[in-house]
Amino acid sequence: DGKTVLCVYPKGHGRGPIVYKRSNDAGKTWSNRLPTPDNWSSSKEVPTLFQVTDKEGNDRIIMFSGLYPIRMAVSNDEGKNWTGLKPIGEFGGIVAMGTMISVKGKPGHYRALFHDDGRFISNKSKRTSPTRFTLYSSLSVDGGMTWGKPETIYSSTRIHLCEPGSIRSPDGKQIAVLLRENSRRENSYVIFSENEGASWTEPRELSITLTGDRHTAKYLPDGRLFISFRCRTAIGSKLGVSNSPIPYEGDWAAWIGKYQNIVNGDPGQYVIRIADNKKGWDTTYPAVELLEDGTILTTTYGHWQEGEQPYIISVRLKANEIDQLAQKSPKLRINSDTMHLK
């Protein structure tokens, strides 16, 4: 209907009972906490929500909760009623599933990507030394009701790629996945697929302007990309938030540019601080929706007031508003691993 928005989040830092809220006016106001199945209280990681459709045309919403085993809840009535959390297999992962790709030309087929650091992929797995991060893919052929055994996309002890966020190219032929680099040695990374995720390119670094965590993207009506993420860089992690040369280190950030900027490794058009987080990097698992009138609705948590507990805010903005602000905003001087205001 273009107005109803559903939001889930943990009552805690990742682990904790899942809280569920609804907005009936496109994020302007939100309900009180809604009733949830009893075992949603046992969630161990940040929940993720996806809309899916099976090959018969049946719509449903699915919600994942991570660690071992990955569990899933299902709603067949647009979020009014939900099942409890049930395991999807004998495998686990951190923040499952990080992103969902609808397989082109195959109704009801979805590819979900997630990561693990060695601790949760099986019931007997353990973290090794040095720590190895692995990016996985799991395929559903029945509209998200069942999920296949995870396949490894990339695994490394040198760079720790995780928290995938997928973007389809404007012509629909290519998929890009932006990745957090959790060893904090390098910029964020990107991988590409031209066969609907059956295989992927080797990872390569993104521009410093897109470096951070939990990238979530939507196309603006004019064809540009809006990508919301947490700004965290290698140099900032080394020096600390307050000593980082990066203007928006530790803040809720966004990037506007073209898909081809990502392909070319270019910096894009704008880097935006959506909100100033007051405590380290403790912020931002950003959801992003494009409303019917072209408004971006993006929602996440952070420490928005000094000395206060974190809370969740929704921000609404339009591309023309950002363009107007940019005319009177300072420019960035960009190097490969740092940037600062001119």
Regions found by a protein language model. Name each.
Residues 1-342:
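Asp-box/BNR beta-propeller blade signature and adjacent active/binding-site loops
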